[in-house]
UniProtKB/Swiss-Prot annotation:
NCBIfam families: PRK04192.1. Produces ATP from ADP in the presence of a proton gradient across the membrane. The V-type alpha chain is a catalytic subunit. Disulfide bonds: none annotated. HAMAP family: ATP_synth_A_arch (MF_00309). It catalyses: ATP + H2O + 4 H(+)(in) = ADP + phosphate + 5 H(+)(out). The gene is atpA. GO terms for cellular component: proton-transporting ATP synthase complex. The keyword Ion transport applies. This is V-type ATP synthase alpha chain.
Length: 596
């Protein structure tokens, strides 16, 4: 520990002298209040410190004390269903201790609760050989999450002692005799610096789809477990609702939700809604698998920059246990703005639109910590982190630096469209401008495991939507009646896909989530209708006759998405009805043809 003194305060940036013994990335206690700060630049004995708390009232001459350790998070039981700020301070306990609705400055409290006792059940015995990543035992943290206690990175040897029972996160639970003869005493908790990725044995290719229950995502633009996706869109297009929907219904074990620089009301919505929502696969409250990190727009700017790293480090910890994790960052644009602010205060050379020249590498560092991996440890385990980042480009202009740097790295682009949002089409993901580079892997995985030609159905549906886009140019110029009968059927099929399949009501109890089997049934019915209608047209029926004869049938297809998951046979039975109805129209059309 070394002590310097403040010589300059510039917003969240503090310049201190007499810091020759300090290192870059060291955590400091700044001023008489002891505010938390991190050294981000060293020049001789002067340190530039970004302070994670409000700096008003700080002045030259006040002390700066370094702790000698980097910004780290505490990893152990007590993370799940908790809400932390950007540097992992527990907000609920913070409020209880300070008796204030605001972040009181200079308060020091442990990140994980030191008083709660957790019931530890060992899975190894004394004398067993262990290495980094091995699971020593488990703690049932919530009904959904079994917290696996692992040997910390850099520790290996023989298990000299291990105890069962109830312990706090600070009490010694096991002892490992290392090769050099020293004894490592381990607790339920370990610390890890947030800016350093946790190690793993091997990176694997992600192939299994992340099922979100959102039809436009799962069908056309899927993301894999271990993939990375970006959700750019203008104000009011529905970025936060898309993130919330994925957080609620994704088929993952753990969800980390980082509210980074967005409005406080959005985190309030999460706190109000998540405890009441039931996970479709387990029947438990989804809050029992969720960690919330809140760094809203009225909190200090510098802590935004740390919040993303705090979230991804917690995600890596659960990944190492063998869990699939999804991390939502809402929004990475606000995080980039925090980088821009600090870069400006440091008087660095600006890049595009004032962002620092290293913006691209910082964004890449974050997304590259996602992925599917084979974890450390003597027993083979797989874990994954799926990173989904919202981007808020000013005015919806996706040519700005944050969006462009993000799109260079991620493989899925869910482009939100203001025009679709204005037409009340939600999720407002534009099916013509969005893309997923995981389509082939996901298609092959589904074809193999579900034994259905899913990739073929998706291609047919997308071709119909693309054909509609081409025909709309003609319709705008000369009207719908000028189209051929076949093209008018294509326009009708595209309308059915858009309104009866892609459009989804997040506030309807049934329509908010669609299982994969239901998605297959819904899309199959629309494609069957289009195929049978085209066949009837080729065999002599007229477009008008097909439309007039299928009013009730099309209404039933449209209402199918509101059928409960446990009544799927009703949707599947519609396929037979579609064929019968169009055969009847064809039979009548044959008679009509003689009259025409």
């Amino acid at each position: 520990m070394s002590q310097g003194k403040i010589i300059k305060v510039s917003g969240p940036l503090v310049l201190a002298s007499g810091m020759q013994e300090a290192n870059i990335q060291d955590i400091c206690r700044v001023g008489d209040l002891g505010l938390i700060g991190e050294i981000i630049e060293m020049r001789r004995d002067q340190a530039s410190i970004q302070v994670y708390e409000e700096t008003s009232g700080l002045g030259p001459g006040e002390p700066v004390i370094t702790t000698g350790s980097p910004l780290s998070v505490e990893l152990g039981p007590g993370l799940i269903s908790q809400m932390f700020d950007g540097i992992q301070r527990p907000l609920e306990r913070f409020q209880t201790i300070t008796e204030s609705d605001f972040l009181v400055r200079g308060v020091q409290l442990p990140n994980l609760d030191r008083e709660t006792k957790w019931n530890f059940v060992p899975s190894l015995s004394v004398g067993d050989a262990v290495e980094a990543g091995d699971i020593l035992g488990t703690v049932q943290e919530t009904n959904l999450v079994e917290h696996r206690i692992m040997v910390p990175v850099g520790v290996s040897g023989r298990l000299a002692n291990i105890s069962a029972g109830s312990f706090t996160v600070e009490e010694t639970v096991y002892e490992i005799e290392q090769a050099e003869g020293s004894i490592f005493k381990g607790t339920l908790m370990q610390k890890w610096p947030v800016r350093r990725g946790r190690p793993f044995a091997q990176k694997l290719i992600p192939v299994e789809p992340l099922v979100t229950g959102q039809r436009v995502i799962d069908t056309f633009f899927p993301v894999t477990k271990g993939g990375a996706a970006a959700v750019p869109g203008p104000f009011g297009a529905g970025k936060t609702v898309v993130q919330h929907q994925v957080a609620k219904f994704a088929n993952v074990d753990i969800v980390i939700y980082v509210g980074c620089g967005e409005r406080g009301n959005e985190m309030t919505d999460v706190l109000n809604e998540f405890p009441e929502l039931i996970d479709p696969s387990t029947g438990q409250s989804i809050m029992q698998r969720t960690v919330l990190i809140a760094n809203t727009s009225n909190m200090p700017v510098a802590a935004r920059e740390a919040s993303i790293y705090t979230g991804i480090t917690i995600a890596e910890y659960f990944r190492d246990m063998g869990y699939s994790v999804a991390i939502m960052a809402d929004s990475t644009s606000r995080w980039a703005e925090a980088l821009r602010e600090m870069s400006g205060r440091l008087e660095e050379m600006p890049g595009d639109e004032g962002y620092p020249a290293y913006l691209g590498s910082r964004i890449a560092e974050y997304y590259e910590r996602a992925g599917r991996v084979k974890t450390l440890g003597s027993t083979a385990r797989e874990g994954s982190i799926t990173a989904i980042g919202a981007v808020s480009p000013p005015g919806g202009d996706i040519s700005e630096p944050v969006t462009q740097n993000t799109l260079r790295i991620v493989k899925v682009f869910w482009g939100l469209d203001a025009q679709l949002a204005q037409r009340r089409h939600f999720p407002a993901i534009n099916w013509l401008s969005s893309y997923s580079l995981y389509l082939d892997e996901v298609g092959a995985y589904i074809d193999q495991h579900e034994k259905i030609a899913w990739a073929e159905k998706v291609t047919k549906a997308m071709n119909i939507l693309q054909k509609e886009s081409e025909l709309q140019e003609i319709v705008r110029l000369v009207g719908l009646d000028s189209l051929s009968e076949k093209d008018r059927l294509t326009m009708n099929a595209a309308k059915m896909i858009r309104e009866d399949y892609l459009q989804q009501n997040a506030f309807d109890d049934v329509d908010t989530y669609t299982s994969f089997k239901k998605q297959v049934a819904l899309l199959s019915n629309i494609l069957t209708f289009d195929a049978e209608a085209n066949r009837a047209l080729e065999l002599g029926a007229y477009f008008r006759e097909i439309m007039e004869g299928t009013v009730e049938l099309r209404d039933r297809i449209a209402r199918s998405k509101f059928v409960h998951e446990d009544q799927l046979e009703k949707i599947q039975a519609l396929s037979q009805t579609i064929e019968e109805t169009l055969h009847q129209i064809l039979a009548q059309g044959g008679l009509d043809n003689e009259r025409h």
